[in-house]
């Protein structure tokens, strides 16, 4: 490095150790970099500012003398060249270069940013053209011959240049682009920072938990201290009571013994007095006549000797061994536990939407001071049973303060209660709480679905023995076969049917849920509804006995019968005179279109009628129906458009094989069309104050097929 020619003298720096790995700090944003040596960085920045001005002192001449008189420090007597990062990097790698301390001090004194800037501005102002000429003599800075590091040696963990990879010591090492290494390092730093943040959060949570444990230890200590004190006070009171009882009994025995001994002592004293008196009497008689003495003394001594003297001690001084009964004390000692029996738990009311059709989640709480080892959760169904017959009870043992009870019956109310247990014993039972399982899923009546371009009427069965609170209908718009997700929900439906507004020309998948206090049921089996046209089923309750309906539900058949003259009993809903059947059209005021396909030689009547049309009359024979009637006789077709037994005089030249019927509530019209040739046949103008339904009648054996749920043809839109 010392042999490089043409290099201007530069400020030498301390030599870095051999194992020092240099990382270019310019790769990082300056604002993200902390100043490691603030004072030195300030000095280097000032050097950089001064280094931008390279000059030759000879060009200035005596200006330095004048500027020195003005108090401005003189420039150093040598040229300054701006330092590139490559120089700084190379200076760190050089070894053996000597830096003089005096040069460093002179350079630091000279490179004051503010003074240098003022000097340069004053120089340009005072010298004018000369300063501009001076700028022309500034020697352009030579590009650093060394390339910046663009690779990163993974083995040495240091930035390198591409040439070092090909020919240097890093030839066999693993290298990667410097930008990629930088991104990897940043990602690793971010990961480590994230881990560190998680550790900090965990340590904070752990510290909070430790604080809670400290508080709990203090509370438990106070509670146990109070418990011990209470038990020991009870034991001491019991012992003191027993002590008093034993001392009192012992004192009574002492008194009894002393009284017996005292009585015996008094008796002994009396006997001694008697003996003394007898001795004195005998001594006196000894001095008297001897004959009398002998008589009296013998008699007196005989009486005295015949008297028995009790010389046995009436009461022994020893006391009997007193056996102390400490059974009750032992019982107290045995009952002195470190914990008390828990208090009665508090069972929580049922949370909304916490149950399924076969399970409920029961929760309860306990006082914080209680210690519990397990819980016994008991339950039984609440039903109307016979008097004297109780429902079976079930018990579950759990460790937690909640339990999910399974294998229950849907839409059924259960009674729950819980008992807490520990070593001291069980707690009292909690209050009883009522929980409800969710209902069973409803069953959609797919054969009874009615729809039009704007709405659909959905009917279903509850599927539950007990009543439910409400129903929810969920709609999913099917745009593609793989589409999923609920588009709309209709909630709070109190009955088992709902009229739902829909978008025309769409297909929907419909499900129904039942709801009660326990939560919603599972979804019902889905049904598909299309709003491409009016779709309605046939009302089997109105079907004449001579008619049958095919399996698809849209073909009406009249077969040959022998007893056709048999009179039928009048019915409220069933046709008995006219061999007819009605359809169930959705009760929506709008435009409804359907078609009937039949043999052109078949006698039939088709049209609309009110629901309460007389069932003992022919269709079109009253003011409750509007119909088109066809009869075929003698190779002639006769068409009548009947209402209240009247018909217009209309001739149809092309017998229709498929008739289209358009019911227009908005314009109060009923139109008939020959579908095959798109021919308009006739239009009724009728005031429909009530909803009407399609009606079909077969005057002779044959069949007709109903096509509904189809789009309205173009020719029908003009009427």
UniProtKB/Swiss-Prot annotation:
The coiled-coil regions, if any, are 178-290
Domain of life per record: Eukaryota
Q: Which residues form the Fibronectin type-III domain?
A: 342-437, 438-531
Q: Which tissues express it? A: Expressed in skeletal and cardiac muscles.
* Chief place where the protein resides: nucleus
Where does it live in the cell?
A: Nucleus; Sarcoplasmic reticulum; Cytoplasm, Perinuclear region
Q: What SMART domains does the entry give?
A: FN3 (SM00060), SPRY (SM00449)
Please report the stretch or stretches of sequence annotated as the B30.2/SPRY domain. Answer: 513-711
Q: Does the keyword Iron-sulfur apply?
A: no
Q: Which UniProt keywords apply?
A: Coiled coil, Cytoplasm, Nucleus, Repeat, Sarcoplasmic reticulum
A cellular component term (GO) from this record? Answer: sarcoplasmic reticulum
The record describes its quaternary structure and partners as: Interacts with CMYA5. In cardiac muscles, identified in a complex composed of FSD2, CMYA5 and RYR2.
Q: What is this protein called?
A: Fibronectin type III and SPRY domain-containing protein 2
Q: Which species is listed as the source?
A: Cavia porcellus (Guinea pig)
């Amino acid at each position: 490095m010392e042999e490089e020619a043409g290099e201007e003298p530069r400020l030498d720096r301390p030599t870095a150790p051999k194992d020092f790995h240099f990382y270019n700090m310019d790769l990082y944003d300056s604002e993200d970099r902390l100043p490691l040596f603030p004072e030195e960085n300030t000095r280097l920045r000032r050097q950089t500012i001064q280094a931008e001005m390279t000059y030759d002192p000879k060009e200035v001449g005596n200006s330095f003398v004048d500027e020195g008189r003005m108090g401005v420090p003189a420039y150093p007597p040598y040229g300054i060249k701006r330092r590139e990062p490559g120089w700084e990097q190379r200076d760190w790698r050089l070894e053996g270069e000597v830096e003089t301390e005096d040069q460093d001090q002179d350079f630091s004194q000279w490179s004051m940013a503010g003074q240098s800037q003022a000097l340069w501005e004053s120089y340009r102002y005072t010298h004018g053209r000369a300063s501009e000429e001076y700028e022309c003599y500034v020697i352009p800075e030579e590009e650093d011959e060394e390339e910046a590091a663009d690779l990163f040696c993974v083995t040495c963990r240091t930035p390198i240049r591409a040439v070092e990879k090909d020919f240097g010591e890093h030839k066999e090492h693993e290298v990667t682009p410097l930008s990629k290494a930088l991104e990897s390092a940043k990602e690793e730093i971010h990961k480590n920072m994230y881990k560190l943040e998680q550790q900090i959060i965990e340590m904070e949570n752990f510290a909070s938990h430790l604080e809670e444990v400290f508080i709990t230890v203090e509370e438990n200590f106070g509670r146990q201290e109070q418990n011990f004190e209470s038990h020991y006070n009870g034991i001491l009171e019991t012992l003191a009571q027993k002590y008093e009882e034993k001392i009192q009994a012992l004192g009574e025995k002492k008194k009894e013994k002393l009284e017996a001994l005292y009585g015996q002592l008094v008796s002994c004293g009396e006997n001694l007095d008697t003996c003394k008196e007898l001795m004195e009497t005998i001594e006196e008689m000894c001095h008297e006549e001897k004959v009398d003495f002998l008589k009296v003394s013998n008699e007196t001594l005989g009486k005295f000797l015949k008297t028995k003297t009790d010389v046995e001690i009436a009461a022994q001084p020893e006391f009997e061994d007193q056996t102390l009964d400490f059974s009750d004390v032992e019982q107290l000692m045995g009952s002195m536990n470190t914990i008390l029996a828990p208090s009665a738990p508090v069972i929580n009311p049922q949370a909304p939407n916490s149950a399924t059709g076969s399970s409920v989640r029961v929760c309860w709480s306990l006082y914080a001071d209680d210690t519990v080892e397990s819980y016994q959760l008991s339950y039984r169904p609440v039903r109307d049973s016979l008097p004297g017959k109780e429902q079976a009870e079930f018990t579950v043992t759990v460790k937690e303060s909640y339990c999910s009870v399974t294998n229950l019956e849907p839409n059924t109310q259960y009674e729950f209660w819980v008992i807490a247990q520990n070593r001291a014993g069980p707690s009292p039972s909690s209050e009883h709480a009522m929980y409800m399982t969710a209902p069973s899923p409803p069953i959609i009546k797919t054969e009874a679905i009615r729809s039009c371009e704007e709405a659909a009427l959905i009917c279903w069965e509850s599927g539950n023995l007990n009543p439910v609170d409400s129903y929810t209908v969920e709609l999913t718009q099917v745009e593609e076969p793989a589409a999923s997700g609920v588009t709309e929900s209709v909630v709070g439906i109190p009955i088992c049917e709902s009229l739902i507004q829909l978008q025309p020309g769409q297909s929907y998948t419909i499900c129904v849920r039942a709801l009660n206090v326990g939560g919603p049921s599972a979804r019902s089996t889905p049904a598909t509804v299309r709003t491409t046209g009016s779709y309605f089923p046939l009302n089997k309750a109105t079907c004449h006995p001579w008619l049958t309906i095919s399996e698809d539900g849209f073909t009406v058949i009249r077969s040959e019968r022998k007893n056709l003259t048999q009179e039928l009993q009048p019915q409220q809903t069933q046709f008995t005179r006219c061999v007819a059947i009605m359809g169930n059209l959705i009760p929506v005021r709008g435009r409804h279109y359907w078609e009937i396909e039949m043999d052109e030689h078949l006698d039939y009547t088709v049209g609309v009628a009110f629901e309460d049309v007389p069932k003992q009359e022919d269709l079109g024979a009253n003011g409750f129906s509007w119909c088109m009637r066809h009869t075929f006789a003698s190779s002639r077709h006769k068409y009548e458009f009947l209402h209240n037994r009247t018909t217009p005089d209309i001739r149809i030249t092309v017998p229709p094989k498929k008739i289209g019927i358009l019911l227009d509530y908005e314009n109060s019209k009923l139109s008939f069309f020959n579908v095959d040739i798109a021919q308009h046949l006739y239009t009724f103008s009728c005031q429909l104050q009530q909803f009407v339904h399609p009606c079909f009648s077969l005057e002779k054996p044959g069949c007709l097929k109903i096509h509904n749920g189809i789009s309205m043809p173009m020719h029908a839109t003009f009427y």
